Amino acid sequence: MNPNQKLFALSGVAIALSVLNLLIGISNVGLNVSLHLKGAGTKQEENLTCTTITQNNTTVVENTYVNNTTIITKEPEFRAPSYLLLNKSLCNVEGWVVVAKDNAIRFGESEQIIVTREPYVSCDPSGCKMYALHQGTTIRNKHSNGTIHDRTAFRGLISTHLGTPPTVSNSDFICVGWSSTSCHDGIGRMTICVQGNNDNATATVYYNRRLTTTIKTWARNILRTQESECVCHNGTCAVVMTDGSASSQAYTKVMYFHKGLVIKEEPLKGSAKHIEECSCYGHNQKITCVCRDNWQGANRPIIEIDMTTLEHTSRYVCTGVLTDTSRPGDKPSGDCSNPITGSPGAPGVKGFGFLNGDNTWLGRTISPRSRSGFEMLKIPNAGTDPNSKIVERQEIVDNNNWSGYSGSFIDYWDDGNECYNPCFYVELIRGRPEEAKYVWWTSNSLIALCGSPFPVGSGSFPDGAQIQYFS
């Protein structure tokens, strides 16, 4: 074959390949157009799937090399909001790791940090936030004098990104009040704030930031609620509220809400003698609340709510390992039905536990007399066995540093787990009354921890502020 014939042959092959490449490109364009027309012709209001087609055509005539690549990728489906269903069990936990620490008091030495107390954590489909009751002032403001008082007209609920100390510029105002709870049902958030006079208080209920109803005091003695997140199942949210004496008989109700409206309420049933400041978590279509008996018990009362029947019962954590503060020494055997008394006893502190059979964990201050230090105790079957004992201990805050309230929370929208990973927070109170020598204010920082399925190391995570810097 002479050179001219070779040239014609190569040119013919190149032209053929180019035509083939052109036909493939035309077919890809046709496919793309047909897919888009099909998507446009079908109206889907909830679940939409986007298809992206990337075409790369390369032709080199001289070397007769053709590269034709078509990549079809599916973007993740958009899921319409739906009600949370408590259809998982709690995850097993081998130890606890810190996931957030806001260092609010340390920042407050030079920054305009808001004075708060009663903080907690609550999650929704987009993530988790810190909620707290502010005192209408910043730490360095002269109005911080006297913020040891729990109930004033200047308090209100705010939220910030978890781990971010609250300032005037980054805090989101929620509602006015000196007691609160908040939870997300998967579609919207319900929030309750209690405001007004001690003997004539009102609870205001909001759903998606809009006022939906109000609840007036029923015992005229400091109507109050959980000071941590409530929990929802299939659109119904359960909240524990108490009205009455903090040191004798009080009147507790379990209330059920749908979109911020009361659909049912039950007076306290079961053997618990006094209920305050419940820390609640959901699992297996149930809600378990570990609460505070401010009247008699150094053991914690619990409320168990069946969210399929909207009914509850109450009793006490069975173990003889006592977790309220103040408390007497641990007992060889506990009591599932009655408060365990002893000196020192009342008044108490908000606390929590995760009652999960062999993987039960309870939290408590290290000091039996004051709100200092914090530890997590693994006590298998503590919720059901009076003779259950501590098998593992993890220190969270050493006993040379102040702690405070603590409570539970769970990110129910963590799709990476086939179970609900337990989490909790600890309030780190600074100022009065323990540090009245240095300052006139009372405020807090916060740490949040979540369970690890693997063994963890050790560490103490105190507030860390040098209080004398504020003198």
Swiss-Prot record:
- What does the similarity note say? Belongs to the glycosyl hydrolase 34 family.
Membrane-related topology note: Single-pass type II membrane protein
Q: Which residues bind Ca(2+)?
A: D293, G297, D324
| Active site positions | D150, Y405
Q: What is known of its domains?
A: Intact N-terminus is essential for virion morphogenesis. Possesses two apical sorting signals, one in the ectodomain, which is likely to be a glycan, and the other in the transmembrane domain. The transmembrane domain also plays a role in lipid raft association.
**Example of a GO cellular component annotation carried by this entry:** host cell plasma membrane
The gene it comes from is NA
**Transmembrane region(s):** 7-27
Organism equals Influenza A virus (strain A/Chicken/Victoria/1/1985 H7N7)
Intravirion compartment segments? 1-6
Localization (cell)? Virion membrane; Host apical cell membrane
Q: Which UniProt keywords apply?
A: Calcium, Disulfide bond, Glycoprotein, Glycosidase, Host cell membrane, Host membrane, Hydrolase, Membrane, Metal-binding, Signal-anchor, Transmembrane, Transmembrane helix, Virion
Query: Which residues are involved in binding substrate?
Result: R117, R151, E276, E277, R292, R371
Provide the protein name. Answer: Neuraminidase
Q: Which reaction does it catalyse?
A: Hydrolysis of alpha-(2->3)-, alpha-(2->6)-, alpha-(2->8)- glycosidic linkages of terminal sialic acid residues in oligosaccharides, glycoproteins, glycolipids, colominic acid and synthetic substrates
Topology feature Virion surface, residues: 28-471
Q: Which InterPro entries match?
A: Glyco_hydro_34, Sialidase_sf
Q: Which cofactor does it need?
A: Ca(2+)
A molecular function (GO) term? metal ion binding
